[in-house]
């Protein structure tokens, strides 16, 4: 989550209302002010909040944005935080963005059995209704409730070029963006 406490609260409320089974919730936060995180923790005491290594920098950037209007660098993505959380998770886990809300009952124990049966080690829940994104992926059915989504054009760069393009090393992606060569949807194609 990045400074979207109302989305996060709604997401957590939907989990409490619609998700059943044996599970724990870990919030990976990348810059939500402590005032909001405290309220969220008070309202949802069972969750664990893990802050990114860039948390303090993001908080400072938000404060500076509010004070002077200086733009927040949206290209600093907490990939290390996500990677560590996935690496240290149980064999089966769900990663959910804060702007995704459950609207129907699901049972994570049932999903775990489906994942075991179909050899799925990462299940990301989300809405696949954006037809614009569909042109870049192949979608196939695993079960009635679970779809497999695979990129049509998977870029396999050497690590250095991956860091440049996907992790914005040396502000490479930012430069391409400012030159008009890429936009915010470019990475979705790969």
Question: Where are these predicted regions, by residue range?
Answer:
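Short, acidic, metal-binding catalytic loop of nucleotide-sugar glycosyltransferases
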Residues: 13-22
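Short beta-strand/loop segment that forms part of the nucleotide-sugar
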Residues: 22-32, 50-54
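Active-site-proximal specificity loops/subdomain of glycosyltransferases
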Residues: 36-89
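Conserved donor-nucleotide/metal-binding helix-loop-beta segment in metal-dependent transferases, i.e.
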Residues: 105-129
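Short, flexible, basic/aromatic active-site loop/helix in glycosyltransferases
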Residues: 139-157
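Catalytic core and acceptor-binding pocket of nucleotide-sugar-dependent glycosyltransferases
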Residues: 151-190
């Amino acid at each position: 989550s990045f400074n979207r406490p109302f989305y996060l609260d709604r997401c957590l409320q939907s989990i409490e209302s619609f998700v059943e089974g044996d599970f724990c919730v870990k919030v990976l936060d990348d810059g939500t002010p402590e005032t909001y995180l405290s309220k969220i923790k008070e309202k949802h005491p069972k969750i664990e909040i893990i802050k990114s290594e860039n948390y303090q920098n993001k908080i400072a950037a938000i404060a500076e944005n509010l004070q002077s209007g200086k733009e927040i660098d949206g290209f600093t993505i907490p990939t290390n935080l996500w990677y560590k959380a996935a690496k240290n998770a149980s064999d089966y886990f769900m990663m959910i963005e804060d702007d995704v809300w459950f609207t129907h009952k699901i049972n994570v124990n049932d999903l775990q059995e489906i994942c075991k049966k179909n050899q799925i080690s990462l299940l990301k829940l989300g809405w696949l209704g954006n037809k614009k994104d569909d042109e870049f992926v192949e979608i196939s059915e695993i079960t009635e409730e679970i779809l497999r989504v695979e990129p049509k054009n998977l870029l396999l760069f050497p690590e250095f070029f991956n860091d440049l393009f996907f992790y914005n090393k040396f502000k490479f992606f930012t430069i391409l963006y400012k030159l008009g060569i890429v936009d915010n949807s470019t990475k979705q194609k790969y």
